[in-house]
Swiss-Prot record:
Its EC number is 2.4.2.7. NCBIfam families: apt, PRK02304.1-2, PRK02304.1-3, PRK02304.1-5. It comes from the Bacteria. It catalyses: AMP + diphosphate = 5-phospho-alpha-D-ribose 1-diphosphate + adenine. This is Adenine phosphoribosyltransferase. It is an enzyme of class 2 (transferase). The lineage of its organism: Bacteria, Bacillati, Bacillota, Clostridia, Eubacteriales. It comes from Clostridium novyi (strain NT). Homodimer. GO terms for molecular function: adenine binding; adenine phosphoribosyltransferase activity; AMP binding. It is found in: Cytoplasm. One of its GO terms (biological process) is AMP salvage. Pathway: Purine metabolism; AMP biosynthesis via salvage pathway; AMP from adenine: step 1/1. Belongs to the purine/pyrimidine phosphoribosyltransferase family. Its main location: cytoplasm.
Protein backbone atom coordinates (compact mmCIF):
# COMPACT_ATOMS: atom_id res chain seq x y z
CA UNK A 1 0.00 0.00 0.00
CA UNK A 2 1.20 3.50 -0.78
CA UNK A 3 0.61 5.21 2.58
CA UNK A 4 1.74 8.57 1.24
CA UNK A 5 -1.42 8.60 -0.90
CA UNK A 6 -3.49 8.12 2.27
CA UNK A 7 -2.02 11.11 4.15
CA UNK A 8 -3.78 14.41 3.52
CA UNK A 9 -1.38 17.32 3.06
CA UNK A 10 -2.71 20.76 3.99
CA UNK A 11 -0.58 23.71 2.89
CA UNK A 12 -0.52 26.79 5.12
CA UNK A 13 -1.80 25.03 8.26
CA UNK A 14 -1.55 25.89 11.11
CA UNK A 15 0.25 28.91 9.66
CA UNK A 16 1.63 30.12 6.35
CA UNK A 17 4.72 28.25 5.19
CA UNK A 18 3.79 24.99 6.94
CA UNK A 19 2.87 21.85 5.01
CA UNK A 20 0.74 19.93 7.53
CA UNK A 21 0.60 16.14 7.28
CA UNK A 22 -2.90 15.11 8.42
CA UNK A 23 -2.91 11.53 9.73
CA UNK A 24 -6.67 11.48 10.38
CA UNK A 25 -7.09 10.20 6.83
CA UNK A 26 -4.97 7.16 7.77
CA UNK A 27 -6.90 6.66 11.00
CA UNK A 28 -10.31 6.71 9.32
CA UNK A 29 -9.28 4.30 6.54
CA UNK A 30 -9.41 0.82 8.07
CA UNK A 31 -7.05 -0.72 5.51
CA UNK A 32 -4.49 2.09 5.90
CA UNK A 33 -4.67 1.94 9.69
CA UNK A 34 -4.24 -1.84 9.71
CA UNK A 35 -1.37 -1.60 7.22
CA UNK A 36 0.39 1.03 9.36
CA UNK A 37 0.10 -0.96 12.58
CA UNK A 38 1.05 -4.22 10.85
CA UNK A 39 4.12 -2.64 9.21
CA UNK A 40 5.40 -1.31 12.55
CA UNK A 41 4.70 -4.66 14.23
CA UNK A 42 6.59 -6.45 11.43
CA UNK A 43 9.61 -4.22 12.06
CA UNK A 44 9.48 -4.91 15.81
CA UNK A 45 8.45 -8.57 15.95
CA UNK A 46 11.96 -10.00 16.44
CA UNK A 47 13.20 -7.34 18.88
CA UNK A 48 11.68 -8.92 22.03
CA UNK A 49 9.95 -5.68 22.98
CA UNK A 50 8.73 -5.54 26.59
CA UNK A 51 7.26 -2.04 26.46
CA UNK A 52 6.01 0.28 23.73
CA UNK A 53 6.24 3.97 24.63
CA UNK A 54 4.00 6.50 22.88
CA UNK A 55 4.52 10.26 23.21
CA UNK A 56 1.45 12.45 23.67
CA UNK A 57 -0.85 12.48 21.88
CA UNK A 58 -0.59 10.82 18.50
CA UNK A 59 1.94 8.29 19.72
CA UNK A 60 -0.94 6.86 21.75
CA UNK A 61 -2.91 6.20 18.55
CA UNK A 62 -0.30 3.94 16.98
CA UNK A 63 1.64 2.78 20.03
CA UNK A 64 -1.27 1.12 21.81
CA UNK A 65 -2.32 -1.23 18.98
CA UNK A 66 1.35 -2.03 18.28
CA UNK A 67 1.87 -2.95 21.95
CA UNK A 68 -1.25 -5.12 21.88
CA UNK A 69 -0.12 -6.94 18.73
CA UNK A 70 3.33 -7.57 20.22
CA UNK A 71 1.98 -8.72 23.59
CA UNK A 72 3.89 -5.84 25.19
CA UNK A 73 2.92 -3.19 27.72
CA UNK A 74 2.12 0.38 26.66
CA UNK A 75 3.47 3.43 28.49
CA UNK A 76 2.33 6.98 27.67
CA UNK A 77 4.67 9.95 27.79
CA UNK A 78 2.68 13.05 28.68
CA UNK A 79 3.11 16.78 28.89
CA UNK A 80 3.98 18.15 32.33
CA UNK A 81 1.25 17.84 34.96
CA UNK A 82 -0.85 15.18 33.20
CA UNK A 83 0.38 12.07 35.04
CA UNK A 84 -0.92 11.42 38.59
CA UNK A 85 2.02 9.60 40.21
CA UNK A 86 5.70 10.31 40.71
CA UNK A 87 7.37 11.19 37.40
CA UNK A 88 10.68 12.05 35.84
CA UNK A 89 10.86 14.93 33.36
CA UNK A 90 12.79 16.04 30.32
CA UNK A 91 12.75 19.50 28.79
CA UNK A 92 13.00 19.98 25.05
CA UNK A 93 13.18 23.01 22.77
CA UNK A 94 10.34 24.23 20.61
CA UNK A 95 10.48 26.79 17.82
CA UNK A 96 9.81 29.51 20.41
CA UNK A 97 10.62 28.40 23.96
CA UNK A 98 10.56 24.93 25.46
CA UNK A 99 8.23 22.27 26.84
CA UNK A 100 8.47 19.43 29.34
CA UNK A 101 7.57 15.76 28.91
CA UNK A 102 7.07 13.32 31.77
CA UNK A 103 6.87 9.57 32.33
CA UNK A 104 5.88 7.69 35.49
CA UNK A 105 8.99 6.80 37.47
CA UNK A 106 7.86 3.17 37.77
CA UNK A 107 6.79 2.75 34.12
CA UNK A 108 10.02 1.24 32.80
CA UNK A 109 12.06 -1.35 34.67
CA UNK A 110 15.82 -1.69 34.38
CA UNK A 111 16.75 -3.89 31.42
CA UNK A 112 13.36 -3.77 29.68
CA UNK A 113 13.49 -3.55 25.90
CA UNK A 114 11.57 -0.49 24.74
CA UNK A 115 10.23 0.53 21.33
CA UNK A 116 9.04 4.10 20.85
CA UNK A 117 6.19 4.63 18.40
CA UNK A 118 5.03 8.06 17.21
CA UNK A 119 3.31 9.59 14.23
CA UNK A 120 6.01 11.96 12.99
CA UNK A 121 9.74 12.59 13.15
CA UNK A 122 10.66 16.22 12.52
CA UNK A 123 13.63 17.77 14.36
CA UNK A 124 14.12 14.92 16.83
CA UNK A 125 13.80 17.13 19.92
CA UNK A 126 10.77 15.36 21.36
CA UNK A 127 12.25 11.94 20.67
CA UNK A 128 15.57 12.79 22.30
CA UNK A 129 13.65 13.76 25.46
CA UNK A 130 11.71 10.49 25.41
CA UNK A 131 14.88 8.44 24.90
CA UNK A 132 16.61 10.32 27.72
CA UNK A 133 13.83 9.45 30.18
CA UNK A 134 13.65 5.78 29.14
CA UNK A 135 17.40 5.35 29.54
CA UNK A 136 17.39 7.21 32.86
CA UNK A 137 14.91 4.59 34.11
CA UNK A 138 17.18 1.78 32.87
CA UNK A 139 15.28 0.83 29.72
CA UNK A 140 17.03 -0.20 26.52
CA UNK A 141 15.66 1.56 23.43
CA UNK A 142 15.63 -1.12 20.72
CA UNK A 143 13.72 0.82 18.05
CA UNK A 144 12.14 4.17 17.26
CA UNK A 145 9.31 3.89 14.73
CA UNK A 146 7.29 6.57 12.92
CA UNK A 147 4.51 6.78 10.38
CA UNK A 148 6.04 9.94 8.83
CA UNK A 149 9.54 11.39 8.65
CA UNK A 150 10.30 14.93 7.47
CA UNK A 151 13.77 14.14 6.12
CA UNK A 152 14.95 17.72 5.49
CA UNK A 153 14.73 18.48 9.22
CA UNK A 154 17.39 15.81 9.92
CA UNK A 155 15.71 14.45 13.05
CA UNK A 156 17.18 11.01 12.37
CA UNK A 157 20.70 12.44 12.62
CA UNK A 158 19.87 14.32 15.81
CA UNK A 159 18.47 11.19 17.47
CA UNK A 160 21.68 9.35 16.73
CA UNK A 161 22.64 5.70 16.80
CA UNK A 162 19.30 3.94 17.25
CA UNK A 163 17.28 1.66 14.99
CA UNK A 164 14.96 4.23 13.38
CA UNK A 165 12.19 3.30 10.95
CA UNK A 166 9.67 5.49 9.14
CA UNK A 167 6.98 4.30 6.77
CA UNK A 168 6.61 7.53 4.75
CA UNK A 169 9.21 10.19 4.04
CA UNK A 170 8.68 13.78 2.92
CA UNK A 171 11.26 16.32 1.79
CA UNK A 172 9.76 19.58 2.96
Amino acid sequence: MNLKEKIRVIEGFPKEGISFKDITTVLNDKEALKYTVDAIVEHLKDKNVDVVVGPEARGFLFGTPVAYALGAAFVPVRKKGKLPCETISSEYDLEYGSDVLQIHKDAIKKGQKVAIVDDLLATGGTMNSVIEMIEKLGGEVVSVDFLIELTDLKGREKIGNYDIMSLVQYDI
